[in-house]
Amino acid sequence: MKLFVQLVLFISLFIPYSTKAVLYVDIKKSNIGNIDLVVSKCACKTEVENELSESITKVIETNLSNCGLFNVKRDAKVESWKSDTVVTISLSEVSNRNLELSFRLSDSFTNRELLTQSVVFLAKDWRKISHLVSDLIHDRLIGEKGHFNTKITYIAEEKDSNYKSVRKIAVMNQDGSNIKYLTNGEKFVSTPRFSPNGKGIVYISYTNGKSYIILKNLKDNTESIISAFEGVISAPRFSPDGKSLFISHSLSGETNILSLDLSSKRTKKITKGSAISTSPSLSPDQKYMVFSSDISGSQQLYIIDFTKKSKKPKRISFGNGRYATPVWSPKGDLIAFTKIQSGKFYIGVMKPDGKEERLLSEGHKIESPAWLPNGREIIFTNAESPSNSKLYLVDLVKKNQKMVFTPTNASLPDWSYF
């Protein structure tokens, strides 16, 4: 097996549905309190078991603490567990290469067992197992799939010995671990995007006056040119079914949105005219496309309804300022965007009909929002200066922000699907 994760999943959900329901957090309410959680590890027999158990515990604690739904109590004593949800972890060596992790999720207030599972895994896969356990805990307590085994891709940028800017496509685990560089920095690269199946990343490269759409295979690290264009290609975005790419194409003074069928390699022009139309993003059901355009004279957001014969764009942004880089929520309920007003940049969200606009973050130059697969958080670029660009997360409910650590400057992020 790939991960050699033999999930001997002894799922013990002994609590009836009526009891389980009260344990779920209503994540749409802003005044809800976090779940108090303790992660406790049992005594280990060997040094290897003890070291790995400690590492796994820390990753689980960090994952659940960072998602903003749990109040993780670190190093809490048993006598303080009176009203907490407790995760108890035990680790034992099965052979020289394999270990078995067992964990138990329980409610100390009612003294009820919520979940018990065991996982056999290779020692080198301990971090993946930590994320897997975090996902299972999140799913059981929140009633929603966790995102701890997902990845982030972005543009990593730094200066070489000649102070020349070097850009690379980077990919890492959602917690910032296991960073890999997919390109060597010899060519200009931009806007990496995960394929819906998670097997590849598409990005744009510019060479000798042409724009190339390149697909990097994440399994074997090979890459292939999907298509080459005269002019400038930008803002690629997969259709939710992964069968097409939607891109912005600038040529002969016009900038329009094209769809590219990945099987036939045929293109179709979606927008036409002298207006600058860019940043396409499809709704999860693929019936609508949101994009940014200056059709009205200033940069605004528009929707095209693919179910109608007339594909006339409908404007949905009417606030002060300019709107850019829209991206549809994976749940389909919101559209994230960048707003520029009076020299300030904002990351915001609105309903697909343009109503209920909310601004979540403000900065000197913040842009390029991308959704987490749970549809509750947004990652974006925060460029405080040309030499200081980082990735930040903001949640929709409390507007809490935190920086995502990267060893170099980082921009243009994208988050993988579940």
Swiss-Prot record:
GO terms for cellular component: periplasmic space. This is Tol-Pal system protein TolB. It is found in: Periplasm. HAMAP family: TolB (MF_00671). The Tol-Pal system is composed of five core proteins: the inner membrane proteins TolA, TolQ and TolR, the periplasmic protein TolB and the outer membrane protein Pal. They form a network linking the inner and outer membranes and the peptidoglycan layer. It comes from Wolbachia pipientis subsp. Culex pipiens (strain wPip). PANTHER family: PROTEIN TOLB, PROTEIN TOLB HOMOLOG. It holds the Pfam family PD40. The keyword Cell division applies. Keywords: Cell cycle, Cell division, Periplasm, Signal. Part of the Tol-Pal system, which plays a role in outer membrane invagination during cell division and is important for maintaining outer membrane integrity. GO terms for biological process: cell division; protein import. Belongs to the TolB family. The keyword Metal-binding does not apply. Residues 1-21 form the signal peptide.
